[in-house]
């Protein structure tokens, strides 16, 4: 079993962000009280036993804008249920992840930290609505290493309207300088979501395939191993196990405002309104996924990652199309699974196989 916890609070709302996030306010104490109730209920409902939780991911929002002591009771609840080799990830922003916060979170059990850097360039940071700077990024990474984190991720965003070869070379130069301080990189192609500050501003996205190819190629030349369209690690042992579980279609519980869980072909949605969540944190609306939904999800997630496609989950006409892709060398076959050697065309392949 895998577990996700959502912390919705942020110092400010980034222009591209479509996740549920709120400015820190008087609801923080009430939220954590509701969150604990939610977690306890979910653990009982799904009968989670000792050593069953393989990964725990605390995301947001910005978990680092909340004092570490707020997480103590949550960890006390979860400790007996964590696998001895559990991966515990927590998102953080460079400006709010202080040395003390990092130290306290590590003492609680967090062993993987993920920094929402997004860019090293001041103009691009401003464009994205980020409130940190390059000095803060370096300081946060140094502090994470100082307190003993062995698994450190850094996020970058590319394909914005500001991106050209010169801008991407700037990002790569600074990434190279701090490469020794990280073990993992998430590089996301900017997506314009409907409920963001960038909505109705499609021109804010570059849509430049050649620049995307250039950027990915340069990341690989920095000796990062690409295991998903947006994720790179220095070694296979430093892959994010939690995200891998998503792509493998594993069961995961999710608690917190606007959280989405998955269990036995069903999706579980918590309340999207803060007051509603605080009043009734155990509420879930349930979506039963059809075999068609599951097949489509398996195709999209498998083709964009090293997970691949399980041949037993394909129907005959999909297998016929797969054979065409094999002949064209757009896929390869190994151990009863089909793999995509070029993640950049994953959506195109998935649509072809599902149509």
Mark where each language-model region is.
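Minor-groove-contacting beta-hairpin "wing" of winged helix-turn-helix DNA-binding domains
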Residues: 337-341
């Amino acid at each position: 079993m895998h577990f996700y916890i959502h912390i919705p609070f942020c110092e400010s709302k980034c222009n591209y962000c479509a996740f549920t996030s709120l400015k820190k306010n008087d609801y923080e104490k009430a939220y954590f009280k509701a969150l604990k109730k939610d977690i306890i209920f979910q653990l009982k409902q799904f009968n989670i036993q000792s050593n069953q939780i393989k990964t725990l991911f605390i995301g947001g929002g910005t978990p680092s804008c909340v004092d570490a002591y707020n997480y103590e009771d949550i960890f006390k609840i979860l400790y007996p249920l964590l696998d001895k080799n559990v991966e515990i990830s927590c998102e953080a922003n460079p400006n709010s992840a202080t040395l003390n916060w990092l130290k306290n979170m590590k003492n609680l059990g967090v062993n993987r930290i993920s920094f929402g850097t997004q860019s090293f360039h001041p103009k691009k940071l401003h464009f994205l609505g980020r409130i940190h700077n390059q000095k803060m990024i370096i300081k946060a990474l140094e502090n994470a290493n100082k307190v003993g984190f062995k698994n450190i991720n850094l996020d970058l965003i590319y394909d914005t309207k500001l991106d050209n070869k010169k801008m991407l070379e700037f990002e790569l130069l600074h990434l190279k300088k701090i490469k020794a301080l990280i073990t993992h990189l998430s590089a996301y192609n900017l997506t314009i979501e409907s409920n963001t500050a960038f909505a109705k501003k499609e021109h804010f996205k570059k849509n430049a395939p050649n620049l995307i190819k250039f950027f990915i190629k340069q990341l690989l030349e920095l000796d990062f191993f690409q295991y998903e369209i947006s994720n790179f690690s220095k070694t296979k042992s430093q892959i994010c196990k939690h995200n891998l579980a998503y792509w493998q279609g594993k069961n995961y519980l999710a608690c917190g405002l606007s959280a989405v869980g998955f269990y036995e072909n069903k999706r579980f949605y918590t309340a999207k309104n803060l007051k509603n969540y605080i009043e009734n944190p155990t509420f879930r609306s349930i979506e039963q996924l059809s075999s068609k939904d599951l097949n489509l999800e398996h195709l999209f997630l498998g083709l964009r990652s090293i997970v691949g496609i399980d041949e037993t989950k394909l129907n005959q006409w999909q297998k016929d199309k797969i054979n065409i892709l094999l002949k064209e060398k757009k896929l390869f076959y190994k151990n009863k699974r089909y793999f995509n050697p070029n993640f950049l065309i994953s959506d195109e392949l998935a649509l072809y196989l599902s149509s």
